[in-house]
A protein has these predicted regions:
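Ligand-binding loop in jelly-roll beta-barrel domains
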Residues: 82-83, 91-115
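Conserved short histidine dyad/triad with adjacent acidic residue
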Residues: 36-52
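A short, N-terminal "cap"/entry segment at the start of jelly-roll beta-barrel domains
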Residues: 1-34, 47
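Well-ordered beta-strand positions in beta-sheet-rich domains
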Residues: 37, 78-80, 94
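Histidine-centered metal-chelating micro-motifs
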Residues: 45-47, 66, 85-87, 91-97
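Short acidic-glycine-tyrosine-enriched beta hairpin
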Residues: 72-90
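Short strand-connecting beta-turns/loops that link adjacent beta-strands
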Residues: 31-33, 53, 72, 102-103
Length: 115
């Protein structure tokens, strides 16, 4: 299957998962799994949230940002991310993603798959 994001539904979600500003995405949903191309403008974020019954893989395409991750029963960690990085949030783990650059969008592909 080929997913053409430019031809898919465009959604703008303010304060997504409790984050800052807006999360803009072209999303594909097959009733079980989600695949999307996301954009966070400078200062925008996807709020900290836990994955339950699914996992998420994020491929950073462009820009710079910060991911906050937390494994069960552990402290949060913060790491810088940039184009070429791949992030994995397994079932039961928590994370958030933020565009920390002063200018330039953080652009990424993500897959949220049920487990």
């Amino acid at each position: 299957m080929i997913i053409k994001f430019d031809e898919s539904n465009h959604t703008v979600l303010p304060a997504f998962k409790g984050g800052q500003k807006e999360f803009s995405a072209h999303m594909f949903f097959d009733g079980t799994n989600r695949v999307f191309k996301g954009i966070l403008v400078p200062g925008a974020s996807i709020g900290f949230h836990k994955h339950e019954g699914n996992c998420e893989v994020i491929f950073i395409l462009d820009g710079k940002g910060c991911v906050i991750e937390q494994e069960p029963d552990s402290e949060q960690t913060s790491r810088e991310v940039s184009a070429g990085d791949c992030l994995y949030c397994p079932d039961g783990h928590s994370h958030s993603l933020m565009n920390t650059s002063a200018e330039g969008d953080l652009v990424f592909y993500a897959v949220v798959a049920r487990q």
